[in-house]
Amino acid sequence: MIIAFQFALFALVAISFILVVGVPVILASPEGWSNTKNAVFSGASLWIFLVFVVGILNSFIA
C-alpha cells in the first residue's frame, strides 16, 4: 500500500509541475489554447483525480 501511495504522490507532483510550466506557455503562445485545450482539461482532470487518490491512500497509511 505504501508503494501505491508513493507512486500516486510522485504522479501528483509530476503532473503539478507539468501543469505549472505548461499552462502559461500554452496560454502565451498564439493559437495555443485552441489547439491544446483538450490536453489542458485532461491534465486538470488527472490532477483532481490524483488529489483524491492520494487523500484516500493516505487515510489507509496514516
UniProtKB/Swiss-Prot annotation:
InterPro entries, per this entry? PSII_PsbZ, PSII_PsbZ_sf
**One matching Pfam family, short form?**
Ycf9
Function, as annotated: May control the interaction of photosystem II (PSII) cores with the light-harvesting antenna, regulates electron flow through the 2 photosystem reaction centers. PSII is a light-driven water plastoquinone oxidoreductase, using light energy to abstract electrons from H(2)O, generating a proton gradient subsequently used for ATP formation.
Q: Does the keyword Chloroplast apply?
A: yes
Question: How the protein assembles, per its UniProt entry?
Answer: PSII is composed of 1 copy each of membrane proteins PsbA, PsbB, PsbC, PsbD, PsbE, PsbF, PsbH, PsbI, PsbJ, PsbK, PsbL, PsbM, PsbT, PsbY, PsbZ, Psb30/Ycf12, at least 3 peripheral proteins of the oxygen-evolving complex and a large number of cofactors. It forms dimeric complexes.
Look up the record and give one Gene Ontology term from the biological process aspect: photosystem II stabilization
State the organism's lineage.
Eukaryota, Viridiplantae, Streptophyta, Charophyceae, Charales
Gene3D superfamilies documented for this protein: Photosystem II PsbZ, reaction centre
The topology of this chain with respect to the membrane is:
Multi-pass membrane protein
Protein name per its UniProtKB record: Photosystem II reaction center protein Z
Family, as annotated: Belongs to the PsbZ family.
> What are the entry keywords?
Chloroplast, Membrane, Photosynthesis, Photosystem II, Plastid, Reaction center, Thylakoid, Transmembrane, Transmembrane helix
A Gene Ontology term for the protein's cellular component? chloroplast thylakoid membrane
| Primary localization class, coarse | plastid
Instruction: Keyword check for Zinc-finger, yes or no.
Output: no
- Organism per entry: Chara vulgaris (Common stonewort)
